[in-house]
Design a protein with these regions (language model features):
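First transmembrane helix
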Residues: 181-211, 310-330
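Carboxylate/His-rich catalytic cores and anion/metal-binding grooves
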Residues: 111-115, 218, 223-232
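Interfacial "cap-and-anchor" motif at the non-cytosolic start of specific transmembrane alpha-helices
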Residues: 229-271, 275-371
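Bacterial N-terminal signal peptides that target proteins for export
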Residues: 2-12
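N-terminal signal peptide c-region/cleavage motif recognized by signal peptidases
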Residues: 19-24
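Juxtamembrane interface at the cytosolic side of transmembrane helices
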Residues: 201-226, 275
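Soluble non-transmembrane domains of integral membrane proteins
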Residues: 25-190
């Protein structure tokens, strides 16, 4: 019996050692020479910074080695102002020096500290974020891109410290430079087409409003114009090209457009569906949403980023749910305008709900949840 217990203990110890070994290996990212793109997040470790400010040297020396945890598939902690440290070891198995681009594909992070470490020493570092001018970025891009070099048959450790007042998500990817530039060109073409489509919608419906003088066209124009500004801000494009050295302007544009979109969307839905004439309770609901959105617009001019974004997210959830509920009820009653409205807007409303769930950390960061 004693031998069996001892044998069981040895087996458990062996399994634990194997698990530790597997975790240690999987936390390193080995470069694949032929791969143009590799996901980094699932090879990354993180730790929450305690009350005292940590230094990169303390982490490099292993003073807090027991506090590192595995990230998993995606880095998304929702709305938090806490500081997080991230690290990943990039291993180069080839006999030649390799250069890659590490991209943090989320343009709304306030402060990012980047440290490139080899043999226990910081070889390169950068401090950037959307609270810093675009010129602070190692590469002038709408997201945050850091060049990383790996010696032949060697490794490089990357440390990141991230703080933000908004949604804390850090999608990490490693690119070959040529592949990144090619993907960026295609990305900008797609975004330009999207922005151009919104401009055409605004101009066309603006002319319709001037001819017909119907308020629904005016609110539709204002909704799409605000959507254009908001998406360009959220994607980091407006900051990159319009006011790259004025992060405070970029912040206010994002906050004000986030507040305005719920106001104009509520006015458009209320007018287009004729809610004030057909549904008394729904009319009170939408009037309340319009008043609340108006107050939020005023607050977005001077309130902090944290408070204003949370208010805008809460209102966006309420407006989306109200539109879906009222639209479906009116469509079920046979209202033709409601059927047209739901056919045109239901996918967008569902998409908004998915995107909001991503912002607050309920869904992981991905292309589909961010776009």
């Amino acid at each position: 019996m004693v031998k069996r217990v001892a044998g069981l203990r040895h087996l458990i110890l062996l399994l634990c050692l194997m698990m530790v070994a597997v975790i240690g290996v999987s936390s390193n990212l080995t470069l694949m020479p032929e791969a143009s793109y590799q996901s980094v997040s699932d090879h990354t470790q993180y730790q929450l910074e305690p009350e005292q400010r940590l230094t990169p040297q303390a982490l490099i020396e292993g003073q807090y080695s027991d506090d590192w945890q595995r990230v998993g598939e995606a880095i998304n902690f929702g709305y938090t102002t806490d500081a997080y440290w991230y690290r990943v070891r990039l291993e180069n198995p080839t006999g030649s020096r390799s250069e890659r681009l590490l991209e943090v594909d989320y343009p709304l992070l306030d402060h990012i500290e980047f440290y490139e470490v080899r043999k226990g020493k910081v070889r390169d570092q950068a401090i950037t974020g959307d609270q810093h001018p675009v010129s602070s970025r190692p590469m002038r891009h709408r997201t945050f891109v850091f060049p990383v070099a790996m010696p032949a048959n060697g490794s490089t450790d990357v440390y990141l410290r991230v703080t933000t007042a908004g949604s804390h998500q850090v999608p990490l990817a490693l690119w070959k430079p040529d592949a990144f530039y090619e993907a960026n060109e295609k990305d900008m073409v797609g975004r330009s087409m999207f922005y151009g489509m919104l401009v055409i919608i605004v101009i066309f419906n603006g002319f319709l409003y001037l001819v017909l003088r119907e308020k629904s066209y005016l609110y539709y124009v204002l909704t799409n114009a605000t959507l254009l500004v908001l998406m360009a801000s959220l994607h980091g494009v407006a900051f990159q090209f319009l006011y790259p050295e004025q992060p405070e302007v970029n912040e206010r544009v994002t906050l004000i457009s986030s507040a305005l979109i719920t106001l104009f969307f509520s006015l458009f839905a209320r007018t287009f569906l004729g809610i004030d004439e057909r549904m008394r309770v729904a009319n009170w609901l939408f009037r309340g949403l319009v008043y609340a959105s108006s107050v939020n617009v005023i607050g977005s001019v001077f309130l902090s980023y944290d408070v204003s974004t949370r208010a805008s997210v809460a209102l966006a959830v309420l407006v989306s749910l109200a539109m879906l509920s009222v639209g479906l009820v009116m469509a079920a009653k046979g209202d033709r305008a409601a059927r047209y409205f739901m056919a045109a807007w239901i996918l967008m409303l569902v998409g908004v709900m998915v995107w909001l769930a991503n912002l607050i950390g309920l869904l992981p960061a991905s292309f589909w949840t961010q776009h």
